Amino acid sequence: VLSSADKANIKATWDKIGGHGGEYGAEALERTFLCFPTTKTYFPHFDLSHGSAQVKAHGKKVADALAVAAAHLDDLPAALSALSDLHAYKLRVDPVNFKLLSHCLLVTLAAHHPAEFTPAVHASLDKFLSSVSTVLTSKYR
């Protein structure tokens, strides 16, 4: 459960990300593909090279979905329902991959905002990404 302090940290972080969401999303995807090569299996039709337009576009989708989630912290299941359906029923993404991408997102955010990435912010973002992952995998059951 996200506390009021967590929610404040999440909203403040998303405000700081601003127009860099797509860039950070793409960087996090690239990190995921490099560190966890099995994640590439879901993107056989993508050019996965550094700076690929397809990775950038998907990174923007990830960032946009997280921005929606950050704006609806009190009702993540409703905010992410369509995305949950897509990943569970059509794409059939292995749930572990959400955790891997979440880790790479945290690394990316820490790399770009080291001063703001305090232990409290880290914990709040980790809880947020875990909550998002839980919602995205909730329809697998």
UniProtKB/Swiss-Prot annotation:
GO terms for biological process: hydrogen peroxide catabolic process. O2 binds at H58. The modification Phosphoserine is found at S3, S49, S102, S124, S131, S138. GO terms for molecular function: haptoglobin binding; heme binding; iron ion binding; organic acid binding; oxygen binding; oxygen carrier activity; peroxidase activity. Red blood cells. GO terms for cellular component: blood microparticle; haptoglobin-hemoglobin complex; hemoglobin complex. InterPro entries: Globin, Globin-like_sf, Globin/Proto, Hemoglobin_a-typ, Hemoglobin_oxygen_transport, Hemoglobin_pi. Residues 1-141 form the Globin domain. Heme b binds at H87. The modification N6-acetyllysine is found at K16. Belongs to the globin family. This is Hemoglobin subunit alpha.
